[in-house]
Amino acid sequence: MGDTRAAATELGYIFTFLLGVLLMSMFSVWAWDIETNTRLRWNEEAIQANMDDIAAAVERADEASRFGGNISYAEEIAWRPTEADESLFWLELHDTELVLIDEGGPLDTTVSLSGTGAGTHEGRVPLAGVERLWVVHDDGMTFLSLDRPQAVQ
């Protein structure tokens, strides 16, 4: 009789242990999923904020270009870092849109521009290791640059 109770108690311990392992595993997967989704959301929000800042600078450059004459304009924009692989990011400026190309993932982003400047827009810059970039309007063209323009120094 004593052996049966001892065996039942041992089986209870084993099942309780296995239930604990199962619950801890489920919690770990759940916590990992929350962390991954949070990181992805933060990346998307940082990229969107960066794109909005650059688009606003392009609009200000367009406004300056409409003053006519030989207007030069330059504005520095700080690039917010993300946890994405930015070595695969390219930023393209077109007349009516700013495009972020993510060659290695799902973070491609487009921001519309008014395109009301007196000149054209063009430029493609890599974002690998970039901490800041410049929106420049010079000689009738608005473009992106990683280097500080000479006229601004």
Spans of features found by a protein language model:
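Glycine-centered recognition micro-motifs in short, flexible terminal segments and loops
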Residues: 1-18
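Short, flexible segments with low predicted structural confidence
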Residues: 2, 25-26, 33
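Alpha-helical hydrophobic helix detector
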Residues: 17-29
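N-terminal export/assembly leader peptides and their processing motifs that target proteins to secretory
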Residues: 29-153
